[in-house]
């Protein structure tokens, strides 16, 4: 046997499974390239820049669409709120605008930056260790700047008064407004943690329940607080309207407390190891169904005899 044939045989054996199973082919290792494009995972600065760009574009797209829809709802004379309450059609239009806008924005940019689009969500993700503190700060800056840019763009492109800023209504006090914002944000952030962070087969559909939860939050809170549940949304609208009420702080403190509350509930479930319990329940249910099916089959066989 020539030396070339021997080398070819050695190379072939190196590609086989070391256990000796000849049909288990293992492809040869590819040479490591030195091109910087293939080391992007180690380029932290570039990764942060991509995340910042994704959060800016996603937040801008979400809030610009929502602001314009909100402006239309509040300018339409047929949907003007009565002095003693809000028009149902007005609430539904605003809620649909925000819910659907965040839904398609998350679907577009979740693969780029995670699609938080909300400083309160970013805080919950950071507390859950889904993103690093540095990435959280980067996302915060992008989201807040995008909120102000979206507010300015919506104000410049639509005629008339800016009518998408948050304000208290229906006699709601600052304390009540604080807790409404807190619990509304908690529901939204908990939805994110349970549908996007938790490993499930339905993670790819997380944008749908997130959009639905924001829709419900707007139906519930708009008449009382204008529904902030997002500091970037509240700040962007306030800058565009040049309207900063003395209670503007509730749209920051309330939402951040809500994100912490959502994380606390999620963390409690992790401590209780709820996934093990759910898995055991599913296994027991499957076993019980299999036993019943076996008993039914046995009974049918006896009856035939």
UniProtKB/Swiss-Prot annotation:
Belongs to the MIP/aquaporin (TC 1.A.8) family. Keywords: Cell membrane, Endoplasmic reticulum, Membrane, Repeat, Transmembrane, Transmembrane helix, Transport. It is found in: Endoplasmic reticulum membrane; Cell membrane. GO terms for cellular component: endoplasmic reticulum membrane; plasma membrane. A motif (NPA 1) lies at residues 118-120. It is a multi-pass membrane protein. This is Aquaporin-1. The gene is AQY1. GO terms for molecular function: water channel activity. The chain crosses the membrane at residues 49-69, 92-112, 137-157, 177-197, 204-224, 249-269. A motif (NPA 2) lies at residues 230-232. Residues 286-295 have a biased composition (Basic and acidic residues). Aquaporins contain two tandem repeats each containing three membrane-spanning domains and a pore-forming loop with the signature motif Asn-Pro-Ala (NPA). It holds the Pfam family MIP. Residues 70-91, 158-176, 225-248 are extracellular. Residues 296-305 have a biased composition (Polar residues). Residues 1-48, 113-136, 198-203, 270-305 are cytoplasmic. Its main location: endoplasmic reticulum.
